[in-house]
UniProtKB/Swiss-Prot annotation:
UniProt cross-references to InterPro entries, sorted A to Z: FAM69_kinase_dom (IPR022049), FAM69_N (IPR029244)
Post-translational modification summary for this protein: Among the many cysteines in the lumenal domain, most are probably involved in disulfide bonds.
Major subcellular location class: endoplasmic reticulum
Keyword set, alphabetical order: Disulfide bond, Endoplasmic reticulum, Membrane, Signal-anchor, Transmembrane, Transmembrane helix
CC annotations in GO: endoplasmic reticulum membrane
Protein name: Divergent protein kinase domain 1C
Entry similarity comment: Belongs to the DIPK family.
Keyword set includes RNA-binding: no
Membrane topology term: Single-pass type II membrane protein
Cytoplasmic side: 1-19
Transmembrane feature ranges: 20-40
């Protein structure tokens, strides 16, 4: 009997040890999963493919093969695949399936982009498959526009009138019309292409599309910002302080455009130097808008289940957790301006030792205004009201700084 009790005791201890080991292993695994998730969130390029010339040339060769087979078309296909007027130069980057390549087009440097590598990887237009038979009746334009409007709504979260959608879609049937439809449909499934096609007429801070071939589209090449640049952007040492003031003012202009000039506010959820470039006149241009969302889509993204505020952070767009219902609020609590102040302006204006041509008092005021701007919102949730006030303060201080720098040159 004592022996049986001893065996039961050893079995109980063994069971407790196994349970403890399992719990420890589960905690260890959860820790690594969390660490991996945080790493991927901060550095999405970790899982990116290696960007090589060989792979990039192979991708474009496959694109041209699909063009010759009559599967796709576009204004740039002839120059790329036949005429030799659009020439590959180098691979810029691959990230999360997206392919970004540099090319030379008729003496102009351009960037070729696609969300996916192969044309066949995009879901086809259902109506085209249904009407694929020879002599099949034409697809009603009303049906097509309805599908396009639905895809745009799914992409942007916006309902647009037909006249706004027109630039995205081939107007009338004719030779090669099916290839045009198939190509346009693959482009419509790329959020950035839709932004670049619809918004440049409304804002100078968005790149226009120059043309396309199948699922690849071309935009102007502009040197992107980088944390490796001392001034975040490629600027000459001479006149750098003036250039930074001009660029900062252009960032403010962009914030104003994105907050006010569209039917809904446009939220930037991935603010970093690499996603912006500057033109020769120091105009800031958003060159990567994969993480930009209009208000309806932003609300949909933010409104998720939560156990704390940290669950309501979507990259640079933050919400707050309502612990009564364990749901993130649909309203963003920080702003584009706040994030730009934090991630861009702090780098330029965090020290009063810069720009000796500018008075110490003005440098100190600008430093304090940037600090105030970067810290607004988040806890109070009143970031939009606060941003409006600090926006005008920053604008006045930057204009005053620019004036002092220009007068010092005389």
């Amino acid at each position: 009997m004592a022996r049986a009790a001893g065996e039961r005791g050893r079995a109980a201890r063994c069971g407790r040890w196994r349970r403890g080991a399992l719990l420890a292993f589960a905690a260890w695994t959860a820790g690594w999963v969390l660490a991996a998730a945080l790493l991927l969130r901060a550095h999405p390029s970790v899982l990116s493919e290696r960007c090589t010339d060989e792979k990039s040339r192979r991708i474009l060769a496959a694109l041209c093969q699909d063009y010759r087979r009559g599967w796709l078309t576009g204004a740039l296909c002839e120059d790329l695949c036949v005429g030799g007027e659009l020439l590959y130069q180098r691979c810029l980057y691959y990230e999360r399936g997206k392919k970004v390549l540099q090319a030379q087009w008729r003496g102009r440097t351009v960037v070729l982009k696609s969300k996916r590598e192969a044309f066949s990887s995009f879901p086809p237009l259902t109506l085209l498959e249904e009407e694929a038979g020879a002599g099949a009746p034409g697809i009603p334009e009303a049906e097509l526009l309805l599908m396009v409007a639905g895809e745009v709504k799914n992409t942007l979260g916006l309902e647009l009138p037909n006249n706004s959608i027109a630039p995205l879609w081939p107007a009338r049937q004719g030779p090669g019309w099916r290839q045009q439809l198939a190509s346009a449909w693959s482009l419509l499934q790329q959020e950035e292409y839709v932004y670049f096609s619809l918004l440049p007429d409304l804002s100078r801070h968005i790149l226009p599309v120059l043309g396309s071939c199948g699922h690849f589209y071309a935009v102007e090449y502009l040197a992107a910002g980088s944390p490796h640049h001392k001034a975040l952007f490629p600027l000459d040492d001479a006149g750098q302080a003036q250039a930074i003031s001009h660029i900062a003012l252009s960032f403010l202009d962009m914030v104003s455009h994105f907050d006010s000039d569209f039917s809904h506010r446009l939220h930037l959820c991935d603010v970093k130097p690499e996603n912006f470039a500057i033109k020769r006149d120091f105009t800031v241009v958003a060159i990567d808008v994969d993480m930009a969302f209009f208000e309806p889509k932003m609300r949909e993204i933010l409104e998720q289940n939560c156990t704390g505020d940290e669950d309501c952070n979507f990259f640079d767009c933050f919400s707050k957790c309502d612990l009564r219902v364990h749901k993130c609020g649909a309203q963003r609590v920080n702003s584009n301006l706040q994030v730009i102040c934090d991630k861009i302006f702090r780098h330029w204006f965090s020290s009063t030792h810069r720009s000796p041509a500018v008075s110490l008092q003005l440098r100190l005021q600008l430093q304090q205004a940037v600090q105030e701007c970067a810290q607004h919102g988040g806890s109070s949730g009143n970031s939009w009201t606060a941003s409006s006030s600090v926006f005008w303060k920053l604008r006045w201080l930057l204009q005053a700084t620019l004036k002092e720098l220009q007068e010092a040159e005389k």
